[in-house]
Amino acid sequence: MNFIDEFRDKESILALKKLIEQELKNPINIMEICGGHTHSIMKYALPSILPKETNFIHGPGCPVCVMPRVRIDTAIKLASMKDTIFCTLGDLLRVPGSEISLLDLRAKGADVRALYSPLEVLEIAKQNLNKNIIFFAIGFETTTPMSALLLQKVIEEKINNVFFHINHITVPAPVEAIMNDENVKINAFLGPSHVSVITGYGIYEPLAAKFKTPIAVSGFEPVDILESVLNIIKQSNEGTFKVYNQYKRAVSKEGNVKAQNLVKKYFRVCDFEFRGLGLIKDGGLELKEEFSAYDASKKFDCTVQSKNESKACICGQILRGLAKPYDCKVFGKACTPRSPIGSCMVSGEGACAAYYKYSKVNA
């Protein structure tokens, strides 16, 4: 048996299903913060085996999805500059801006590169000394340490043609913003997995206490998620509001302190605009003033005029937990992974992409 098999074991899944059915006394709304959890929930069809009173609500845990259009347009402007190589991670290239996407811009001849690791920037910079290398850094606490490490190496190696546009965001701030929204009815949270490896699960304890809401930090496998749901239901029955660490094989209370200290060395918190949630206090990170020489937003003109989002797209409501992909009139029709209208259909962690991939709409 492979290590992961025990977390997909059919008998364990059915036993947990039975326990959940026995424990559930009232309808419960559980928001999974992480986009990876959304995909696991849909991939393993967990809603279909759980009581209908168990409702999963999809949260703002996809960094590409929550990136506002103004920042996409800024990326496109930077990538359009002469003598520039624009580098970033993941699905950002396919997110529509006001006019085009970064992928469209690359098709027109711009040097836009999707990286597997931020550290690839070092070789790109050394091989292109006559060009400006812009690293458009995105992601929650999971990817921030790699951006910090890249900056550290750029400084150590005295590389002067690399500039950072920082779009890193934090998990607790948008969760708090959602809980402060009286239109959102959430009884509990599935805490993120990979983020918690870095931050530790202790970071969520103030949220659980403030909003009297159970939080279960969960792994990605079906047994992980069902164990977390069972704990949440038991906490709800008992009237307790604790952070439960189901993902003990990877997450500790303190997290990766070395990575945290590296981030603190180069970054400071700042307000950040999230798609669908608006400007959130302390929701993002920016370079500290002493590293402003590496800040693309200070080195180059980043002012843009962005157009409003398509009225047909409800990504903003989905990210706030007020709607699901099926509520969108263009889902699976005008909006598909091949021709996405909204960011939730673009990203591999987006709720719409998960529904499209694993639900009957694509059968």
Regions found by a protein language model. Name each.
Residues 27-30, 162, 239-248, 274, ...:
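Flexible, glycine/charged-enriched surface loops at secondary-structure junctions
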Residues 227-317:
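Internal helical hairpin/lid segments
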